[in-house]
Swiss-Prot record:
It is an enzyme of class 5 (isomerase). InterPro entries: PsdUridine_synth_cat_dom_sf, PsdUridine_synth_TruA, PsdUridine_synth_TruA_a/b_dom, PsdUridine_synth_TruA_C, TruA/RsuA/RluB/E/F_N. Belongs to the tRNA pseudouridine synthase TruA family. This is tRNA pseudouridine synthase A. It comes from the Bacteria. One of its GO terms (molecular function) is RNA binding.
Length: 267
């Protein structure tokens, strides 16, 4: 039996989602609970592998089980054993051919920035502070330049291992908030550190150090040295996982370009 689990977590105290040889991870927390329940190791398979310090409003993973347990009981048992910074939102059965990683056709991230005269210690780890004056309109113009299908070699970590760095962005915008702005980006998939590099670049645009019309040339050059900065992980949230083409079509229209992950390397 294959079980799909929807979760949320605050990433401050995690080294990321994926299990590490040492250190606290989200995967470790769940596999420890499942091992206790099954009396043997059970591997979980996530839709996304968030990095150290990155949060998730919505994340999914699946696992296979021989235990005949009601979905509400799965949810109750896991939440009872989990620490306060992870919560199981929903549990349901899925087809045995469903795969959290390969059936994921899109993701949405939100990066939160607050501004002011000084840092707010109560926002530490959950939002990024920028005290310089920023031009949000100019930043949004630059953000729009990333929409579409592009090679993002110049906007990801040089440690990115996947061969194809072509991704499609359906949404890329700056949204003004009461204390700053959010950068909201939805795409077919994202490369290692890609969202954080995009945010750092957009902040440079807001400061007047870069221009929106720099984007096409930077994409064409595919040179990370031309976009050297990376924003911290604190303000980054995995906001939504799209597990079916219908979800993307509903939000972005019937002409949306769907990438099926069984034929696309993904992070």
């Amino acid at each position: 039996m294959r079980i799909l689990v929807e979760i949320a977590y605050q990433g401050n105290q995690f080294l990321g989602f994926q299990i590490q040889q040492q250190g606290r991870t989200v995967q470790q927390q769940f596999e420890k609970i499942l091992k206790r329940m099954h009396k043997h190791h059970v591997r979980i398979h996530p839709s996304s592998r968030t990095d150290r310090g990155v949060h998730a409003y919505q994340q999914f993973f699946h696992f296979d089980t021989e235990l005949n347990i009601d979905n509400k009981q799965w949810q109750y048992a896991m939440n009872r054993a989990l620490p306060d910074d992870i919560y199981v939102k929903n549990v349901r059965n899925v087809d045995e051919y469903f795969h959290c990683r390969y059936d994921c056709v899109g993701k949405r991230y939100r990066y939160k920035v607050y501004q002011g005269n000084h840092r707010n210690p109560f926002k530490s780890g959950t939002e990024t502070f920028v005290n310089e004056t920023l031009d949000y309109d100019k930043m949004n113009k630059a953000a729009q330049e990333f929409i579409g299908t592009h090679d993002f070699t110049g906007f990801c970590s040089q440690k990115t291992e996947v061969e194809s760095k072509v991704r499609t962005l359906y949404q890329s915008e700056i949204v003004a908030t009461k204390e700053g702005f959010d950068y909201v980006v939805t795409g077919s998939g994202f490369l290692y550190n890609m969202v954080r590099v995009l945010v750092a670049f957009l902040i440079e645009v807001g400061k007047g150090k870069r221009e929106p019309n720099d984007v096409p040339k930077l994409l064409e050059d595919k040179n990370r040295n031309n976009v050297p900065l990376t924003a911290p992980p604190d303000g980054l949230y995995l906001e939504k996982i799209y597990l079916s083409p219908e979800e993307l079509i509903q939000e972005y229209g019937k002409d949306v370009k769907i990438h099926y992950k069984k034929s696309l390397e993904k992070h």
